[in-house]
Swiss-Prot record:
SUPFAM superfamilies: Arginase/deacetylase. NCBIfam families: agmatinase, PRK02190.1. The gene is speB. This is Agmatinase. Pathway: Amine and polyamine biosynthesis; putrescine biosynthesis via agmatine pathway; putrescine from agmatine: step 1/1. It comes from Serratia proteamaculans (strain 568).
Length: 306
């Protein structure tokens, strides 16, 4: 026999249904999954180049390049041996209706969290993090935010809602505590008086990863953490396929070292956003996003014993 029902598929190009070929489960609330992958194909809140709606599909497609590895380096264990993950596909919302997306995503997240699941989400533009934060704050209370980005996304913009204002609204709604939150890789204009600790790109590139991680852990403390990674945190040399690229960013190696070093944080939710494959070269941006998502899952699995 030669279908997925009868054998494992190790091809790098076929059967890219779920992220990393994790099983698809469109009713994940009733499953035995611990972590649920959700795609959010939304880019209506984008200020510059659109195309993030195609991000989840691109990330899933390129993730087949990562699915073959069992005892992944440098973790030296197989993720599947320690944590049960399913991909529930993409959220459904009314085309052209941003409120529908926000409401449906928040309701989906609330139902998953109430069922004892945790979420790794793929955007989509960065606005999608706001309804995710609302759901997670209802379940876990006020959280710390660990935020990788070229932009702080704390701009008021007349109090409008877009992919650059989520972290202006989130503290005002009581979802996150800026004094226990860190923004990493910033290299654009920002308000220095909003309470967040900003580790700008120059610091992150020049200081040791161990030094940075010690500071991050001190700031975050024991609070529940929401981890969000805007792919434009990476330098465009490593992630050209995004809507608002900014030169002078992190290397993929530096980003991986920082993410891998966050094992002691109490991470309760995670996302990777702003992949716009129309501007990508050789799928390197999608591959970076897929790899970061995989490393985030390994970060959780590493806390568990066999």
């Amino acid at each position: 026999m030669s279908t997925l029902g009868h054998k494992s598929d190790n091809s790098l190009v076929s059967n890219a249904f779920g992220f990393l070929r994790f099983p698809l489960n469109f009713m994940p609330y009733d499953s035995d999954a611990e972590w649920v992958i959700t795609g959010i194909p939304f880019d209506m809140a984008t200020s510059g180049r659109a195309g993030g709606r195609h991000g989840p599909a691109a990330i899933r497609q390129v993730s087949t390049n990562l699915a073959w590895e069992g005892n992944r380096w440098p973790w030296n264990f197989d993720l599947r041996d320690r944590v049960n993950v399913v991909d529930c596909g993409d959220i459904v919302f009314n085309f052209g209706d941003a409120q529908s997306m926000s409401d449906n995503l928040q309701a989906h997240a609330e139902k998953l969290l109430a069922a004892g699941k945790r979420m790794l989400s793929f955007g989509g533009d960065h606005f999608v993090t706001l309804p995710l934060l609302r759901a997670h704050a209802k379940h876990f209370g006020k959280m710390a935010l660990v935020h990788f980005d070229a932009h702080t996304d704390t701009y008021a913009n007349g109090s409008q809602y877009d992919h650059g204002t989520m972290f202006f609204h989130a503290p005002n709604e009581g979802l996150i505590d800026p004094t226990h939150s860190v923004q990493i890789g910033i290299r654009t204009e920002y308000d220095h008086d909003n309470g967040f600790t900003v580790l700008d790109a120059a610091q992150v590139n020049d200081r040791s990863a161990d030094d940075l991680l010690a500071q991050i852990k001190q700031i975050v403390g024991d609070m529940p953490v929401y981890l969000t990674f805007d792919i434009d945190c990476l330098d465009p040399a490593f992630a050209p396929g995004t809507g608002t690229p900014v030169i002078g960013g992190l290397t993929s190696d530096r980003a991986l070292k920082l993410v891998r070093g966050m094992q002691s944080l109490n991470i309760v939710g995670m996302d990777v956003v702003e992949v716009a494959p129309a501007y990508d070269q050789s799928e390197i941006t999608a591959l970076a996003a897929a790899t970061l998502g995989l490393e985030m899952l390994y970060l959780q699995a590493a806390k568990k014993t066999k």
